[in-house]
From Swiss-Prot:
It comes from Citrobacter freundii. One of its GO terms (biological process) is methylation. It comes from the Bacteria. Its EC number is 2.1.1.113. It catalyses: a 2'-deoxycytidine in DNA + S-adenosyl-L-methionine = an N(4)-methyl-2'-deoxycytidine in DNA + S-adenosyl-L-homocysteine + H(+). Pfam families: N6_N4_Mtase. The gene is cfrBIM. Belongs to the N(4)/N(6)-methyltransferase family. N(4) subfamily. Disruption phenotype: Loss of methyltransferase activity. This is Type II methyltransferase M.CfrBI.
Length: 376
C-alpha cells in the first residue's frame, strides 16, 4: 500500500507535501507575503490529522501554517497568526540566493554479511570508514555477576565503551544512527554493613556519546512486565517493613538511547540522497508503529546466553532506523538477535563477538552457511 493510499484510507484530502505547499502558498498570497517566506519540508501529524508547513526566512524557521488534512482548510488557531507573520516579514533582510550544490548520491555500502571474532575495539578497525548504516547494540553489564568482577574499576568499563563508541563513529555513515540498549546496574552489597549501589550507566554513556561526536535524538523506555525486576531483590525490604526512606521501586524499564552521527545535514538529506529510491519506498512503515517512547516488550530467555534482548526490540529498532539492504552493526553481538532480525527485515549485518561459542550460535541462527564471511 502506498503512502498516498494510506492517507486516502484515513479520509485525507491533502495527501502530499506538494498539495500542502500549494495550500500554504495561497494563504500567504492572500496576506501579500508569498515573496517573503520559503517553505521547509511539510510534515503530516497523524495524531491530530494536520499538515504542518514550516515558514522559513534567511535560513531560520519563522513559524508554520497548519492545514486540516481532512478538509484541506487552514487551521487558523494552530497556525502562526497573520499580524505576527506580517511583522516578521518586515524584519526579513533578503540575502542573495545560494548557488544550488550538485546533489550527492549516498553510495551503497560494499559490506556483506560478516562476523568479526575478537575484541570489538580491535576488530572494528578492519571495517572501512562510513561502511555501516546503523549501529544497534546492548553492551555487557558492568559487574552484574555477584560471584566475580569482570572489570577492575567502573572507569575501566567506561574506557572500553568509549573506544567502541569512537570506532563506531568512524565506520558509521554520515547522519546515521547509533541506538544502544542500556540501563542502570545494581551492585549488591558485599556485607550487611554496606549498602548496595545503583550506578547510572546511561547518563555516563550519554556524556561519552556527546564527546565522541554524536547528537542526542531520543530516549525510549523498554517496559517489561511488573514481575520482571523482582529477581534483583530491590524493594523487598520496603515491601516487608514499609518504613519511609527505604522505598526503592522495582526496575521494570531499560533505556533505548538514540544518537545520530553529528552532521550539518537534516535527516531528510539521508532520505532524498539515498542510492535506491526503491529501497526507501519498500522501507516505509505501516500504521502499526510505536506511537510513544514506551515500548512494552517481554524479556527473552536463552539458556545458551545469560543476557539476551528480545527479538521484538531489535526488530523495531532496525525497522525504524534503517532502510532495506542497509548494513546493521552490533559490536556486542552475543547470541546474534540483531543479525537474525536484520536478515528477516532484508538488511545485511556485521556482528562482532569475542566468544567462539556465541559465534557458533549466530551461524546457527542466521542459517547463511557459506554466504557468511567470518574474520578472526
Amino acid at each position: 500500500m502506498t503512502v498516498k493510499n494510506n492517507y486516502l484510507n484515513r479520509g485525507y484530502l491533502v495527501t502530499s507535501t506538494t498539495q500542502a505547499k500549494k495550500i500554504a502558498k495561497l494563504h500567504l498570497e492572500k496576506l501579500d507575503l508569498a515573496d517573503k517566506f520559503s517553505f521547509g519540508l511539510p510534515e503530516v501529524d497523524d495524531r491530530y490529522h494536520v499538515w504542518r508547513v514550516p515558514l522559513v526566512a534567511t535560513g531560520h524557521r519563522i513559524g508554520e501554517i497548519v492545514i486540516n488534512s481532512k478538509t484541506s482548510t487552514i487551521d487558523y488557531k494552530k497556525s502562526s497568526k497573520s499580524p505576527f507573520l506580517i511583522k516578521k516579514a518586515m524584519e526579513v533582510v533578503h540575502t542573495p540566493k545560494k548557488v544550488k550544490k550538485e546533489k550527492k548520491i549516498i553510495s551503497k555500502s560494499p559490506l556483506n554479511n560478516m562476523l568479526l571474532q575478537g575484541n570489538c575495539a580491535e576488530t572494528l578497525k578492519k571495517l572501512p570508514d562510513e561502511s555501516v548504516n546503523l549501529v544497534f547494540t546492548s553492551p555487557p553489564y558492568y559487574n552484574a555477576k555477584p560471584e566475580y568482577s569482570e572489570y577492575h574499576t567502573y572507569d575501566e568499563y567506561l574506557s572500553l565503551l568509549r573506544s567502541v563508541i569512537k570506532e563506531c563513529h568512524r565506520v558509521l555513515s554520515e547522519g546515521r544512527f547509533f541506538v544502544i540498549n542500556v540501563s542502570p546496574v545494581l551492585i549488591r552489597r558485599a556485607s550487611r554493613n554496606e549498602a548496595s549501589k545503583r550506578i547510572a550507566v546511561p547518563f555516563d554513556l550519554h556524556r561519552l556519546f556527546i564527546e565522541e561526536g554524536y547528537e542526542f535524538i531520543d530516549d525510549i523506555h523498554w517496559v517489561k512486565p511488573e514481575g520482571a525486576g523482582w529477581a534483583l531483590g530491590r524493594g523487598r525490604r520496603f515491601a516487608a517493613d514499609r518504613n519511609p526512606l527505604q522505598y526503592k521501586p522495582v526496575p521494570v524499564t531499560e533505556y533505548i538511547l538514540v544518537y545520530r552521527k553529528k552532521t550539518d545535514k537534516l535527516i531528510d538529506w539521508n532520505i532524498r540522497n539515498h542510492h535506491s529510491k526503491e529501497d526507501v519506498f519498500d522501507s516505509k512503515i505501516g500504521d502499526d508503529y510505536e506511537k510513544t517512547n514506551l515500548w512494552k516488550i517481554n524479556p527473552s530467555r536463552n539458556r545458551k546466553h545469560p543476557a539476551t534482548f528480545p527479538y521484538g526490540l531489535a526488530e523495531r529498532v532496525i525497522k525504524y532506523y534503517s532502510f532495506k539492504n542497509d548494513v546493521i552493526l552490533d559490536p556486542f553481538a552475543g547470541s546474534g538477535t540483531t543479525a537474525k532480525a536484520a536478515i528477516d527485515l532484508g538488511r545485511r549485518f556485521v556482528m562482532c563477538e569475542i566468544s567462539k561459542q556465541y559465534i557458533d550460535l549466530i551461524i546457527e541462527g542466521t542459517m547463511l552457511g557459506g554466504d557468511l564471511k567470518i574474520i578472526n
